């Protein structure tokens, strides 16, 4: 007899069923025609509590409304498992009716928490996230037909460019570690847990591999975004691929990273900040990443020499130089009055006691490379700390000028305070002279990079190192002339031109500005343009400022 309703097969396919037994659709398809589904009345479903509900394990509760629990089926269907490499686990949940309730609850519990909460995420899920992000990165990279070479070759090129053009100004990474991280970009490499003796007990075993993957992809994004295409030979769009991979991987272990930060936590965020600045020219996202790094440095109390010690001498050294680079950036922002500082002597308990150089003697440069000989690293760090002192001295002087001006105005003692014999005025003048004298400390290898002093050094090595010092010289001198103009403008704005040796005549102010600009242009003579171009938005912004303020 004809069936009274559509068969199960037609209902699933949502096609018209003629009600026969077997129906025409099933006959044509050659499949059994069955009617096992129990029809229910249409209308809102009424939830019925099972008789054994008291004995069932409770599912996770909704945070916003604790009166309602999350349905297992809804949760499994709403989670985008393909983004976390969980297809097999979901199939096991749906395809195995004998799966125990406790194992189902355990699986759902892992999905109910954000993937960055590594404390409640199993090692297999962390590994799945790693493999998924890497697979997507390699796929997007290979889809760009214009690229030459594979992804590992590109990463090696980025490390080479960083060490020659940007490491002299931002020596915040360990070259052997960067190069050892490159194989993680290959789909043929399996992330291995850190050996037990080197494992931080506070983090899962795979976290060090995730940190290194995030670090090398952040470096590639940073380099390709900042250096000209004539150097990187890669379109700028490639930097976005690496940045998304780095950002996605950081999210995968972010909770652990924020709870137990290390030197990579700072370096990665600084390179993310640089990428945002160089690709958009906007400071919002860039400032956010930089601020995160500063907050982590403050929480670790890296300003205190007693807090810098780590079991690994390399880690201690990386934390030290990362802090000083953040400090330099903060002082530069203070001088430009672009935002309030996060790292400052006035808000650090006991002041900043961190030494420029500690007892760590681990080289950052790869000693196996011939171009790194002849004390290249020690010379680079000398110039780095000189630039830091320039920014810090200028920032303090600008703050003191503004504070002094506000003090004399509030006390109506302007005539007396501007007396040449006033102690505070004399102190400001002395600090200005101290700042201008810093340019005399620029070493000979930075002042004249092409004049190699060691005849035993190979010509190829000398050329490589000269490029390093040209890049550093460009940065140091740009900072120096920018700070001179900022100090001059601050004195003019606060009615204290005497600090820089000028009268109250606006003509003398304009003449001094032109003099500083001319000195800067003269100083740039002979500088390889590629060294200026490779500094990215920072150098361009400094040069733009020198043009605008005049």
Locations of the language-model features?
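N-terminal cysteine-rich, zinc-dependent DNA-binding domains of eukaryotic transcription factors
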Residues: 1-47, 51, 142-152, 533
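Intrinsically disordered, low-complexity activation-like regions
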Residues: 21, 27-38, 61-169, 222, ...
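C-terminal, low-complexity intrinsically disordered regions in eukaryotic proteins
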Residues: 44, 51-117, 139, 375, ...
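C-terminal transcriptional activation/regulatory domains of eukaryotic transcription factors
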Residues: 138-264, 270-282, 375-378, 447-452, ...
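Intrinsically disordered, low-complexity acidic/Ser/Thr-rich segments used as protein-protein interaction/activation
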Residues: 178-209, 258-273, 282, 290, ...
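TPR repeat positional signature
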Residues: 215-216, 220, 264-265, 269, ...
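Long, amphipathic alpha-helical regulatory blocks in the mid-to-C-terminal portion
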Residues: 237-260, 295-305, 352-366, 389-403, ...
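Amphipathic alpha-helical scaffolding segments
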Residues: 286-295, 408
